[in-house]
Amino acid sequence: MVCAPKQLELAKRPQNLPAINRLFAPWSYFIDTTYAVGPRECHDPNHPIGRNDDIMWKIRLSDYARDIFGIFGSECGREWALPHSDFFEGLVAVSGRYYHNLKPDEFGATVIPFFEMVYHDCQICYGKYGYSADKAAEFVAHHVLCARPLYYHSFPDHLYWKSTGKREKQQTPVPDVACYTRSDNGWADGVHPLDVFIKNTYEVLGPLHSVTAHDTLSNLKFLTEDFTLRQATYGRSKDATTVIVNFGTKDAQVESTLGGKVTLPPWGFVIEGPRFAAFHARRWNGQDYGTGALFTLRPMNKKDLKDADRIRIFHAFGPETIKWKGNLYKVQREMVIRVL
């Protein structure tokens, strides 16, 4: 590591950040490791610094990058960095797990979205490092509970989407850890599994983060004694968005305002808020979905879902029929419905 005063000095060189801005004019910039490395001391007699000095210089580097590019973030994240950055990379998850090699079950622990209780409304957070989309069900479920956008790290070589050969899963594990690569009867049917995964997760996590980005986690509940069925509420009163996620290995039964009696498969969820609703469920609003279906609903104007006369419905996989306000709609990919 270069000591902090020299980091800023190097960043200001004409051929460094100023050149990047001149050549490419990015609106956002990421500097690796700045926040990942804790406060350091430097005993060089020419520029000795203590831990607080190290933080001060890293803040100056952050502010400098932010002034140039507009949006700035760094790896991991620090509380002192919150006023000086816009996003943290690595706080939500690491390599498809909760945190590096940490295994919560070995400690008898349950991971909860604690950061979201305090700072969800003032910092965008992502995970980091590669993971396998066909093993990412719990990873996605964790992002749903945290109401955070997903990142996409590992891509096959070359024109991977043109690859031929059988793409069906040879065997479906129980629970289905590859469930978010499903596309049967849905929007991405026949598309490469990675692209299916990107589309499915983006359609859920993108809008979910959009409607909760300025809210904190106001309530967290464990709905079962084994802590596997979890409910998170973002915001308060009529503007709140509620998320219920099943982290268990068996189906879970829940009640929701829009869906009534809902059956969630392992890693399934139901999301309900004034501006967005979604579910990965085996039963929702009186409709049975066999091995599960994934739908999202968004109003097409500034009205809330309950008052909207035009609603976009996205269908990722599973049976194609959804019931809304007493009417049945068959949605293979996506559709804007008119509600009378």
Functional labels for PLM-detected ranges:
Residues 2-338:
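Active-site-proximal substrate-binding groove within the catalytic cores of carbohydrate-active enzymes
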